[in-house]
Amino acid sequence: MDARLDPALKIAEFLLKIKAVRLDAKKPFTWASGWKSPIYCDNRRSLSHPVMRTYIRQQFVEAINREFGKPDMIAGVATGGIAHGVLVAQEMGLPFIYVRSAAKEHGMKNMVEGDLTQGRNVVVVEDLVSTGKSSLSAVASLRDAGCEVKGMVSIFTYRLKVASEAFANAKVRLHALTDYNILLEQAIVDKYITEKDLASLRRWREDPANWPEIAATKPAGAVPEKPAK
């Protein structure tokens, strides 16, 4: 990692380097939703790199203290947010719980696993926020269990309009360590993509559901956006 970079650019640089994020404007990936996307993100790869894993943990702790104040507990979202959530909880000396993607079919049929008697104020840890559907489903499960969700932190977000609206409607504040615009900025610097690729990649975020069509019909040379804050 380049020590001269600010934290958001530094994390973006490393995600690209270890191929946790892959960009390909010509051969798109297919998401579970059916969307064709020029980006694929697997932040679980960061867990295999101790230096970056530690840096992410430190940035999460700083962000939680700064943005939300110290909570009673840390909650991880299965599965990508569990390991990072445990590391954050350990660093902060806090209890840890996690939220399943679906209730168990046996036993207590829990959605939330862990001891909920140790506090009610929770900050949620995610590895990735895309549309926000699964992340906010976890928030709903925590609220149903009687928790007060102070906010959510994630390693990365695409900052899609649909996610921003969903988080606003759910009254959940999200703080991401890095995001799509910052990633593209670093990808240009490190020559992972060309300026021509950049125009197509920016158009994807405008209308991800219809991106292959708009990428083919819109002219190149989109006006650059400022990195999201």
Named regions from a protein language model:
Residues 62, 66, 86, 90, ...:
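Short, well-ordered alpha-helices that flank and scaffold nucleotide-derived cofactor binding pockets
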Residues 69-78, 153:
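Short glycine-rich phosphate-binding loop at a beta-alpha junction
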Residues 1-69:
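Active-site-facing substrate-recognition patch
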Residues 72, 120, 150:
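Conserved acidic residues
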